[in-house]
């Protein structure tokens, strides 16, 4: 069941990515799939952590990327941008109690690829996470497991 859920979610997003010629899949979704399908009871796999961990990290990545690009320093200071993006993402996830390790990779993707648009937050991030979470909910219902509400910190 776990492998099927991962196959369906990553396959669907990869298909959208390929056939619509737009980004719908990013590398951090692979790690998210491992957590939400393979370890659904882990604190980092809770819906609140998955959703907000990626969302906050994408917002940080886009905002700081925008600043670096507008100042004209993205290329020569990409190393600094990478360090800032991931560090800020970790800090915000800790403060908001929404730590989701793949979120760090979501922020890092902004630095490495130079994403500086709000569209990146919507697609691939939010669309991809919503697709993956819907599939996770369906799988957990089929397995007879109830997963925590999105409003509960760390599913507690």
Residue map of PLM features:
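Alpha-helical transmembrane segments and their membrane-interface boundaries
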Residues: 1-69, 73-83, 92-94, 116-156
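Membrane-helix boundary connector in multi-pass membrane proteins
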Residues: 96-121
């Amino acid at each position: 069941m776990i492998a099927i859920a991962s196959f369906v979610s990553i396959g669907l997003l990869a298909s959208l990515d390929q056939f619509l010629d737009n980004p719908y899949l990013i590398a951090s979704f692979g790690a998210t799939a491992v957590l939400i399908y393979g370890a659904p009871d882990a604190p980092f796999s809770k819906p609140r952590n998955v959703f907000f961990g990626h969302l906050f990290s994408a917002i940080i990545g886009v905002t700081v990327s925008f600043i670096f690009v507008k100042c004209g320093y993205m290329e020569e200071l990409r190393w600094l941008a990478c360090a800032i993006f991931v560090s800020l993402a970790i800090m915000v996830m800790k403060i908001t109690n929404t730590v989701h390790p793949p979120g760090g990779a979501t922020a890092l993707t902004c630095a490495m690829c130079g994403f500086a648009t709000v569209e990146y937050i919507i697609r691939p991030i939010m669309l991809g996470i919503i697709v993956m979470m819907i599939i996770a909910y369906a799988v957990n219902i089929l397995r007879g497991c109830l997963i925590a509400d999105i409003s509960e910190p760390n599913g507690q």
